[in-house]
Design a protein with these regions (language model features):
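Charged, amphipathic alpha-helical regulatory modules used
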Residues: 1-87
Length: 87
C-alpha cells in the first residue's frame, strides 16, 4: 500500500472546474501545476492509505467549510500564477 495525499485530487478537480469557466488564463501544464502547487502549499494535506480511507475523505471533503477553503485557495492560485506565469 502507498500513502497518498487526497487533497491533490480535490485541488486538481477544483482547478479544472474553475479554469473551464475562464478563457483569459493560460492552461498549459506548467501553469496548471504551478497553480496546484501554490494551492496545495496553503491547504492541509489529507493523507489516505486504503480505498475505505478514500471514501471517508471524499465524504469529509463535502463539508462546506472544507470545500470553501479549497475553492478560495485555488482561486487565489489562479490569480497569482496567471499574473506571473513562469514561461
Amino acid at each position: 500500500m502507498k500513502i497518498y495525499n487526497y487533497m491533490e485530487d480535490t485541488v486538481r478537480d477544483t482547478l479544472d472546474s474553475l479554469l473551464s469557466k475562464r478563457k483569459d488564463i493560460c492552461k498549459c501544464q506548467k501553469c496548471k501545476l504551478d497553480m496546484m502547487t501554490w494551492a496545495l502549499n496553503r491547504l492541509p494535506p489529507k493523507y489516505i492509505v486504503t480505498d475505505k480511507g478514500r471514501m471517508y475523505t471524499k465524504l469529509k471533503e463535502q463539508e462546506i467549510q472544507s470545500r470553501a477553503d479549497v475553492v478560495r485557495e485555488v482561486t487565489r492560485a489562479i490569480s497569482y500564477i496567471s499574473s506571473k506565469p513562469q514561461h
